[in-house]
Swiss-Prot record:
Transmembrane segments: none annotated. PROSITE patterns: AA_TRNA_LIGASE_II. This is Phenylalanine--tRNA ligase alpha subunit. Keywords: Aminoacyl-tRNA synthetase, ATP-binding, Cytoplasm, Ligase, Magnesium, Metal-binding, Nucleotide-binding, Protein biosynthesis. Its EC number is 6.1.1.20. GO terms for cellular component: cytoplasm. The lineage of its organism: Bacteria, Pseudomonadati, Pseudomonadota, Betaproteobacteria, Nitrosomonadales. It holds the Pfam family Phe_tRNA-synt_N. NCBIfam families: pheS. One of its GO terms (molecular function) is phenylalanine-tRNA ligase activity. InterPro entries: aa-tRNA-synth_II, aa-tRNA-synth_II/BPL/LPL, Phe-tRNA-synth_IIc_asu, Phe-tRNA_ligase_II_N, Phe_tRNA_ligase_alpha1_bac, Phenylalanyl-tRNA_Synthase, tRNA-bd_arm. It comes from Thiobacillus denitrificans (strain ATCC 25259 / T1).
Length: 344
């Protein structure tokens, strides 16, 4: 049997001269592995006389411990050397100034929404909200929209679930359902605006599948169409900050109002002289409005003989486009910082 001390001396010399961790693992296998030199010595103990086996076994175990201790010390030294090398290669000057954080800004749609809410709040309107997933009753039936109305078609409305009666759940196509819910839980008189996201199956330069809308409602015993015209004309002139802004109302039709009207303003791009934005008419359509239909009041239990009211609805993105001179609605939703930074 080979002398364990000779093997230890040989192993220590190899360990101390080892240049890297992979080589160190090879040295370990050569002395302590399944076929390592010290392991083979242990295997040979079975052939030795019993009286010599105990002494030889103790010497071999001492040799293993010496090699293992040397391996541990050398491994730690090599690991530290590797860490020092990496740190030196990745030196960071902590005195250098850090990267500046970009300045956040309010999105133009959020900015427009807040401006509209503030203007209506200044004349006594409260903000009401409601669910974006609505039922057929609140989105259509309670608003006097007949079953054969085009708005109920699949190509215009996102239906989530339909029942056998033709109703069901859907993504609201306007915020008018908020008015219905509010009238069910609040007694007149009331003045509210209902801002929020609405959804329609439409996408082009001036339409997106999701957009923001604000609908307003004023219900009292003596509200008139003159009140409607005064409120909306005053709002538009304040919104665009133009006291001389021209406005006009054209007859129209909506199932939930009677009479109904479309409101136009003088083109804010060309001052009414005619341009591409207003199709050279000098006018821009901005909202729909009208006196609340008696059937809507009956659906929510409001006395249609005693109370009267007006309602209106406008697109927030539409007004933002006009206020900021944006010609493509989709730009508001592309999150392009080059575009958004212009409004900060």
């Amino acid at each position: 049997m080979r002398n364990p001390n000779e093997i230890v001396a040989e192993a220590l010399a190899a360990i101390h001269g080892c240049p890297d961790l992979p080589s160190l693992e090879q040295i370990k296998a050569g002395y302590l592995g399944k076929s390592g030199q010290l392991t083979e010595l242990l295997k040979s103990l079975g052939a030795m006389p019993a009286d010599a086996r105990k002494t030889a076994g103790a010497r071999i175990n001492e040799a293993k411990q010496a090699v293992e201790a040397a391996l541990k010390i050398r491994r730690e030294a090599l690991q530290q050397a590797e860490l020092d090398r990496q740190l030196a290669a990745e030196t960071l000057d902590v005195t250098l100034p850090g990267r500046g954080l970009g300045t956040a800004g309010v999105h133009p749609v959020s900015r427009t929404l807040a401006r509209i809410e503030a203007l209506f709040h200044s004349i006594g309107f409260d903000v009401a909200t409601g669910p974006e997933i609505e039922t057929d009753f609140y989105n259509f039936t309670a608003l006097n929209i007949p079953e054969d109305h085009p708005a109920r078609a699949m190509h215009d409305t996102f239906y989530l679930r339909q029942n056998n009666a033709g109703g069901g759940e859907l993504l609201r196509t306007h915020t008018s359902p908020v008015q219905i819910r509010h009238m069910q839980t609040h007694e007149p008189p009331l003045r509210i605006i209902a801002p929020g996201r609405v959804y329609r199956c439409d996408s082009d330069v001036t339409h997106t599948p999701m957009f923001h809308q604000i609908e307003g409602l004023w219900v009292d015993e003596s509200v008139s169409f003159a009140d409607l015209k005064g409120v909306l004309a005053d709002f538009m002139r304040n919104f665009f900050e133009r006291d001389d802004l021209a406005v006009r109302f054209r007859p129209s039709f909506f199932p939930f109002t009677e009479p109904s009207a479309e409101m136009d303003i003088g083109c804010v791009m060309c001052g009414g002289s005619g341009c591409r934005v207003c199709s050279h008419t000098g006018w821009l359509e901005v909202l729909g409005c009208g006196m609340v239909h008696p059937n809507v009041f009956r659906h929510v239990g409001v006395d249609a003989e005693r109370f009267i009211g007006f309602a209106f609805g406008l697109g927030v993105e539409r007004l933002a486009m006009l206020r900021y001179g944006v010609d493509d609605l989709r730009l508001f939703f592309e999150n392009d910082l080059r575009f958004l930074k212009q409004f900060n």
